[in-house]
């Protein structure tokens, strides 16, 4: 972690008394657009996360993907649905929704309930979902930076 994040002071916290399943953390660096050129730009995090979410949804992995801002939520949802259309599995589009500020409280409760009930496989959210909502049994929780 020191090498990845450039931090000198890193402390491992490995004891937690709360009951939970195993967790694994993965830091994902988007691939180069042109691997033959060392200084090449990288694939956009939105595009890369879209492919990851489609991969997870196809395998029925319950996922909440966090984005910093509303615009990222909207862009990512649009890309995921386009990718599902391209792969001719558009019916899975109904299994993923966004959750962000700007929605009415009633709409947010409907989305939460759909996730609790198992009607949704994925939510693309801002930190609006982090505040006071406990959705258990998630398989994955990527964060777009």
Predicted regions and their residues:
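Alpha-helical scaffold elements adjacent to nucleotide-binding pockets in ATP/GTP-utilizing enzyme cores
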Residues: 1-4, 75-83, 110-114, 137-140
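Conserved interdomain linker/interface between the two RecA-like ATPase lobes of SF2 helicase motors
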Residues: 2-73
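Conserved acidic residues
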Residues: 10, 121, 139
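Short hydrophobic/charged patches on amphipathic alpha-helices used for structural packing
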Residues: 50-54, 112, 130
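Short, surface-exposed connector motifs at secondary-structure boundaries
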Residues: 56-63, 92-95, 134-140
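Conserved helicase motor "Helicase C" RecA-like lobe of SF1/SF2 P-loop NTPases
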Residues: 70-93
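Conserved helicase ATPase core of P-loop NTP-dependent helicases/translocases
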Residues: 97-126
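A short beta-strand element within the Helicase C-terminal
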Residues: 124, 129-145
């Amino acid at each position: 972690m020191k090498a990845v994040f450039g931090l000198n002071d890193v402390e491992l916290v490995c004891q937690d008394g709360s009951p939970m399943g195993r967790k694994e953390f993965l830091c994902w660096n988007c691939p180069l657009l042109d691997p033959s050129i060392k200084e090449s730009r990288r694939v956009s995090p939105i595009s890369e996360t879209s492919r990851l979410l489609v991969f997870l949804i196809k395998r029925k992995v319950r996922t909440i993907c966090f984005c910093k801002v509303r615009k990222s939520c909207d862009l990512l949802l649009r890309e995921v649905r386009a990718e599902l259309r391209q792969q001719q599995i558009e019916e899975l589009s109904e299994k993923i929704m966004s959750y962000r500020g700007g929605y009415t409280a009633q709409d947010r409760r409907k989305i939460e309930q759909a996730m609790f009930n198992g009607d949704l496989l994925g939510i693309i959210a801002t930190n609006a979902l982090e505040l006071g909502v406990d959705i258990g049994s998630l398989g994955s929780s990527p964060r777009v930076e």
